[in-house]
């Protein structure tokens, strides 16, 4: 699922992360503007999380595609908003233990 994908991706980068998207919501530092997003940043919705491939593309496991999908962030935001509401947080993980 989405949070396991993020947990595994962060682990590959040396960042220890919780298993669920709720606790993952507190990883790293807050990003105030989506124009600042870069590879490895996290995008959160209520009950969902994805990781940025680059400044404009989101990688996430989702029920819409029933797979891990790579899609433009704007498309993901618009589609997910219908089900889960707006983005709740943008975070930049830091290489430190977060548990």
Question: Predicted regions span which residues?
Answer:
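Catalytic cysteine-centered active-site loop
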Residues: 1-37
């Amino acid at each position: 699922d989405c949070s396991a994908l993020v947990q595994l991706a962060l682990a590959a980068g040396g960042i220890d992360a919780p298993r669920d998207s709720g606790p993952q919501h507190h990883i790293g530092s807050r990003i105030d503007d989506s124009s600042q997003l870069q590879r490895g940043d996290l995008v959160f919705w209520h009950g969902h999380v994805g990781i940025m491939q680059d400044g404009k593309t989101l990688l996430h496991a989702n029920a819409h595609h029933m797979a891990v999908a790579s899609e433009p962030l704007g498309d993901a935001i618009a589609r997910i908003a219908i089900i889960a509401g707006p983005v709740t947080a943008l975070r930049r993980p830091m290489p430190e233990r977060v548990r």
